[in-house]
C-alpha cells in the first residue's frame, strides 16, 4: 500500500471466493505524479499522458500463475480503459514476462530498465500497450478474451475505494451484465 492507492482503481481476481490476484490502475492527469515518474522520465516519443493509464502491482498467488488468470485481470483493465476513454497502458515487468506481454498484448518496450524498490530487487522493463490496436484487430485479439465473459464474471471481483471507485465498480458490473445478455 502506498500514497497512490487512495485514488487507484483496484482490480481483484477470485477463484472459488478466494482472492488469487490483483492489480492497480492509476488514471492521473498529465501534470500529476504517476507511480513510474519516480524511476524514469516521459519522453516525447511516448503516447500522450492524457491518453494513458498507469497499471502496476499485478500480483498472482503462486499456484495461479497461468495465462488464464492474467487474461482475466487484463480484461478488466480493458473494460476500465474503455470507460475512461484511455487508449494506452503504461506498465513494467521483469524479464521473465517480456515474452508474454509481447505475445498476448503486443507490448511495445521502451528500452528503459528501472529498479523499483517496492517491487523487489529484479530490474523491470517499461512498456506501453495500445488498446486501440488490440480492439481494431491490428494486434493481439482482445475480442477473443471477451468471448469468455462467463468465466470472467466468476473470476473477476472489482474492489475499489472511495466514491470514485464505486462508480467504476458499477461500470464493470454493467459491462459484464451487458456482455452476458448479448452472449
State each model region's role.
Residues 7-9:
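Short loop/turn microsegments at loop-to-beta-strand junctions
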Residues 12, 17-28:
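Conserved beta-strand in the GNAT
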Residues 20, 30-32, 134-136:
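Short, acidic Gly/Pro/Ser/Thr-rich loop/turn segments
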Residues 33-133:
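Acyl-donor binding region in acyl/amide transferases
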Residues 121-183:
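Charge-rich, low-complexity intrinsically disordered segments
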